[in-house]
Amino acid sequence: MHTRRLVKRSVIGSRVYAPGLTGDAAPLTGVIQAVKQDNRDASTGHRRNVYTVLMQDGSVKEYSEEEIAQMTAKAPLKSSLKSTCNGGQRDGLTQGQNGGVQRGEALSLSPESTEEPRVLEHKRTGRALETEKDHTRSVSLLEQKRKVVSSSIDVPQARKSEEEVDMDKVTAAMVLTSLSTSPLVRSPPVKVSEGLNGSWKDGGFTPSSYSSSGYWSWSAPSDQSNPSTPSPPLSADSFKPFRMPSLSGPPDDNIDEHDGNSLLFDEPIPRKRKNSMKVMFKCLWKNCGKVLSTAAGIQRHIRTVHLGRNCDSECSDGEEDFYYTEIKLNTDSVADGLSSLSPVSPSVLSPPPALDQRQPDGTNGTKSESSSSTPLSRSAPSALYLVHTDHAYQATTPVTIPSTSSTGFTPSSSSFSISWQSPPVTFTGTSASPTHSRTQGFGEQHSQTIAVLSSPPRAAGSLSRKSRGEGKKCRKVYGMENRDMWCTACRWKKACQRFVD
């Protein structure tokens, strides 16, 4: 029993076995009264513990740690007992601590003091058993607590592998890419006035399908009512659905309300292609040539307009599949074709001489009065004519002007047409259809004419710019190896601020 191993629990009062006085093998029980260290082996650094033991017969003797350990190993019973000694025993403990009791000396006690341990021996035995049970119970509880603590430790879950993390990143990137190419994100809100001045007007397409959700598709302005008008070339911007939050024009009668939903949800969103090729669907009906971006839209167009059926696609027999085909459009080539067009200035616009003979007599005074004004005001119509922006199939046949001038303005009593031949855009209007026509005042006519005629100079300004990559940049001037000499904009891959065109 080493004192350093029992720091919190004292051995004083423990019941041990010690050799008898006669030296035979029969051990005697005793209670440890004091502990001290023997300094005889101080030179070797090892110190033995010497225990003062109150023997069973009342005598007090000192035993070394080895003697008590040997006798305890041979003893049939191992137990520990807290000492509840009387005053005489505590006196013996005091004497043992003070070194007053030597080895082999017996402390003489009165007969009453020697009988008291014998009388209380039975009580001590019972208490020893209870103490041993309590000690065993405490040890078992301690072990259980340790097990509970070890089992209740939160073990972290297995971390995901790097492949799974990479797959999550790839999935997120695909979702973001699909969202960025969706019609809602790709097409910003465009006002009607901005649409008249925008670049999409140069493509020769008029709005032909409209739904309650506010999405438009664009097609060529040719229909059954206008069989002689050829289909103009397609443009790169003609297939993007535009969102019209406020639209003053009339809706299309032959397109149901599910057009926008089918455009968004019925078919997968097309991904951007690196080769700038777009798959479109063209109507093969005679003198139609309508082009839509979805198969569902072109089927609905053929079913409702040409076949005269108003039922849904579920009750259709599939006849409309024979009247459309897939076409691939290279948007880069269309953009190059538009960039090769020569700009036109409205200052040189003048009506052709053949139009003077076609004009009625009532407009001669108006024409003579407007001859002294500016060319822009000379091209504006008078208040006698009604301006309408109906769809192509709702309008009458426009007057075609075979002249070399890029702009022709043909006022008449029934209709007039303003057409840009390169690229062709036709605005047709009638005053005979009250259900689809919209009458405007003179102020609206004048502003609309200005909007129509002001787009060619804007196109001229955009076409006069240098194409991408022609201007000087820090990357071209200094090179990739001298990146520290670049301007801040070039470092962040923005437009160069040092070499401005």
From Swiss-Prot:
GO molecular function: DNA-binding transcription factor activity; RNA polymerase II cis-regulatory region sequence-specific DNA binding; zinc ion binding
Annotated region described as Disordered, given as residue ranges: 80-138, 183-203, 216-267, 340-380, 398-419, 427-446, 453-472
Motif window: CR1: 472-476
Stored InterPro entries: CR1/CR2-DNA-binding_regulator, DUF4772, Znf_C2H2_type
Motif (CR2): 490-494
UniProt biased composition (Basic and acidic residues): 115-137
Pfam families noted in UniProt: DUF4772
Low complexity bias locations: 368-380
Biased composition annotated in UniProt, kind: Polar residues: 80-96
GO cellular component entries: nucleus
Keywords (A to Z) from UniProt: DNA-binding, Metal-binding, Nucleus, Transcription, Transcription regulation, Zinc, Zinc-finger
Superkingdom of this protein's organism: Eukaryota
A Gene Ontology biological process term: regulation of transcription by RNA polymerase II
Localization terms from the record: Nucleus
Zn finger residue spans: C2H2-type: 281-306
Signal sequence residues: none
Role description: Transcription factor.
Domain writeup: The CR1 and CR2 motifs mediate sequence-specific DNA binding.
Identification of the protein by name: Zinc finger protein 704
Native source organism of the sequence: Danio rerio
